[in-house]
Amino acid sequence: MAVVIRRASLEDLPAIIKIQHSAFEIESRLYGGRPIPPMWETVDDVAADWPSTLVLVAEVDGQIVGSVRGRLDGDTCHVGRLSVHPEHQGRGVGTQLMLAVEEAFPQARRFELFTGHLSERNLRLYGRIGYVEFRREPVGDGVWLVYMQKDGTTASASSA
């Protein structure tokens, strides 16, 4: 399975949102099926952030199967909305997207992201590529967000 990572275009947004909704719907089951923000995000929401956010997509056989976003704030790149179509999860697509977003921000001294405390697959993936937990915040109903970071100089070296 050859995966091609490229910069997204505005025309890709409907496919990106569809995959994001299906991926995060599965994620929401870990938290009792409660809706989580990525599930109600719209094409217009993503388009509004377009000028300040890099969106990358992963394609297999010309079909979008995943995406990730990165936004530089000072010397920190905030990584978010890593989404892989359920049929393509567990095949390295998420890892490739994460490494590609890091590579796209060589000026970043730090990468930061968050995920839910019950999202073991996410936590394992991020840990495997060098992210470490630095904070947990409660968001209600026993759910915690786990904030993770990675040194930008390490990111450049690991994606080489």
Predicted regions: what they are:
Residues L82-Q89, T115-H117:
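A short, internal acetyl-CoA/4′-phosphopantetheine-binding micro-motif in the GNAT/acyltransferase core
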Residues E112-G116, L123, G127-Y147:
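Conserved catalytic-core motifs of GNAT/GCN5-like acyltransferases
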Residues V84, G90-E103, R124, R128:
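Conserved acetyl-CoA-binding loop-helix of GNAT-fold acetyltransferases
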Residues V4-K18:
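A short beta-loop-alpha structural element at the N-terminal edge
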Residues M98, A104-H117:
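Conserved GNAT acetyl-CoA-binding A-motif
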Residues I17-V46:
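Conserved GNAT-fold acetyl-CoA-binding loop/helix
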Residues D44-V57, H78:
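A short helix-loop-beta-strand connector motif used in the catalytic cores of GNAT acetyltransferases and
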Residues V57, Q63-R71, H78-S83:
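Conserved beta-strand in the GNAT
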